[in-house]
């Protein structure tokens, strides 16, 4: 049985839109793309690589897939371990209609997302890892399919842009299983989804 894990770059105010470049995702007139780049470091790159190398297969939304497919197949240096990992991995692509998938080892999950992902989780071992893919992740979270979240939080408030969790996301508590403080104020946190949140009161009897 696989676990479904999610990895995201995220701002202090929860924005995940266009972390890697100004033209990555301009939906809604978003003009702050590339906000991760000034804070990136060798230590962060190593931590991201360790996380992605845990994946047995990848699950990507169509937009993230297209961004990756425009770049990684062009990186052919065998010494680039991230390119080797991403190019060699099976990539399951979520899209409402069947897309043309030219990147090697890419497969459409089909029209029934929930059934397809449940089947993928049941058929193997290790991690089925969703990278970025905010719209897809929101759907998976609403379906109760996400087992873990790995978040790299950057010390920036963007004030606008698409946020990781929808306003109607189901309430969930999280168990912290891994934590590290990295260079330039970036934090690494890995959470396990732990069920419904509990509540209490500070009121005195």
Question: Which residues does each PLM region occupy?
Answer:
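Portal/gating segments that form or line small-molecule/metal binding sites
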Residues: 1-145, 155-205
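Acidic-residue sensor for enzyme active/binding pockets
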Residues: 148
